[in-house]
Amino acid sequence: MAQPMLIDLEELVERLDRIGVRLCLPSKRQQIEQLEHEAADPDLWQDPQRAQSLLRRLSQLRDLVQEWETLSQQARDLLELRALASDDLELAGQVEQEATELAERVRQLELRLLLTGQYDGHDAILAVHAGTGGVDAQDWAEMLLRMYLRWAQRAGFAAEVVDLLEGEEAGIKSATVEVRGPYAYGYLKGEAGTHRLVRLSPFDAAHRRHTSFALVEVLPLVEEDDDVEIREEDIRIDTFRASGHGGQHVNKTESAVRITHLPTGIVVTCQNERSQIQNRETAMKILKARLLELKIRQRQEEQARLKGKPVVTGWGNRIRSYVLHPYTMVTDHRTEVSTPNIQAVLEGEIDPFIEAYLHQQAAEGEETAAASDR
């Protein structure tokens, strides 16, 4: 007798059909044809930023449509195989294994459909800043940095630390990471805010319980955005020698770069690259991302003001608590998702929090749209 099927393949086919409707496939295929036509223009690369933007969009659309086509065909093939597997235990086991893998890919595709923001498809800049609390807060900031680097590795993203300011005794004061990959900003944007740690301090001789805070910023990396203009007269560029742990200089040349945007007071630094030119290019990318994030936040605050709902940003936006003592629990204060497996979370297993936030935002967007239609 064949093993029972645990995955409802008929339901998967129905979900994929609904995804196809939501994708507006005829429109997507038309967009692909138009972008392919533009990509064939021999003059395209006269504007490298526009060319990169166009090719990124083309690649994302192709991948999305191809993924749906592949999953839809696989679901229907498995349905046919299941009918043949009623008396074949080996084939039934193979169908079940492939159906389980298919269900996970369908879930991931449904999640990707939630990433509809203007900048969701772009790379991201993630910055971690230690709060007040001295070495405990700096150690906590380093733990968060490691968590996000592990998450990026698990998710298949390329992550590079482009600036790092280490603490005098332990940990870090701040770090900036460039995360590259499809929809990196869309997945990470919900991580912005204050993260709180409660534990018995390893730096306290009395081993007392301490509460530490760290701030996470997430910015879209949109190099070709025309909304952000940086004029030469609006910036001041300083160079200095890159420093290591405790402020020790690790480079005899002034390769590190600090850029100050005079109108806003925003300051960015980069000291990770080998040359001053590379550090300047990276610092300019980060500055542009910060200016774009400032514009996004201003728009959000204006929309919230019109709706009568204040927007809390920065240190006042406490999004998650990580408790190591007197019990172990990670709790997201926005979605109420929690887990006692804090070690797994600190090893980068934060997908449940990311996904719950995206679903919550999508639900709130649907409620807002429904209210505006009344």
Swiss-Prot record:
One of its GO terms (cellular component) is cytoplasm. It comes from the Bacteria. InterPro entries: PCRF, Pep_chain_release_fac_I, Pep_chain_release_fac_I_sf, PrfB. Transmembrane segments: none annotated. Methylated by PrmC. Methylation increases the termination efficiency of RF2. HAMAP family: Rel_fac_2. NCBIfam families: prfB. This is Peptide chain release factor 2. It comes from Thermomicrobium roseum (strain ATCC 27502 / DSM 5159 / P-2).
